[in-house]
């Protein structure tokens, strides 16, 4: 089942999500939009198993990283039958 990982612009660049991911799905990339000068990126979503450890590790009030499991992705896009 395919999962998607969305990084929101509320990311503070703390690297907690990157360190929490057991499969190295996430990485940090340069970004001028926050004090840390970096933001999480999800270049390897095909490896995501949906454990949501990245979500749990995120210290922001609004989860800056969200994992949408395959069926959640379909529902959120209005494609559920």
Curated annotation (Swiss-Prot):
The protein's required cofactors: [4Fe-4S] cluster
Highest rank taxon of the organism: Bacteria
EC number per UniProt: 1.97.1.12
Top EC class for this record: oxidoreductase
InterPro entries: 4Fe4S_Fe-S-bd, 4Fe4S_Fe_S_CS, PSI_iron-sulfur_center, PSI_PsaC
Pfam families: Fer4_7 (PF12838)
Membrane-topology annotation of the record: Peripheral membrane protein
Subunit structure: The cyanobacterial PSI reaction center is composed of one copy each of PsaA,B,C,D,E,F,I,J,K,L,M and X, and forms trimeric complexes.
Described function: Apoprotein for the two 4Fe-4S centers FA and FB of photosystem I (PSI); essential for photochemical activity. FB is the terminal electron acceptor of PSI, donating electrons to ferredoxin. The C-terminus interacts with PsaA/B/D and helps assemble the protein into the PSI complex. Required for binding of PsaD and PsaE to PSI. PSI is a plastocyanin/cytochrome c6-ferredoxin oxidoreductase, converting photonic excitation into a charge separation, which transfers an electron from the donor P700 chlorophyll pair to the spectroscopically characterized acceptors A0, A1, FX, FA and FB in turn.
Protein name: Photosystem I iron-sulfur center
Organism annotation: Prochlorococcus marinus (strain SARG / CCMP1375 / SS120)
Gene coding for it: psaC
């Amino acid at each position: 089942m395919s999962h998607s990982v969305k990084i929101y612009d509320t990311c503070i660049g703390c690297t907690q999500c990157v360190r929490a991911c057991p499969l190295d799905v996430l990485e940090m990339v340069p970004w001028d939009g926050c004090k840390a000068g970096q933001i999480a990126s999800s270049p390897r979503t095909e490896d995501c198993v949906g454990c949501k450890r990245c979500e749990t590790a995120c210290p922001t009030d609004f989860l800056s990283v969200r994992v949408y499991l395959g069926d959640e992705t379909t529902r959120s896009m209005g494609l559920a039958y």
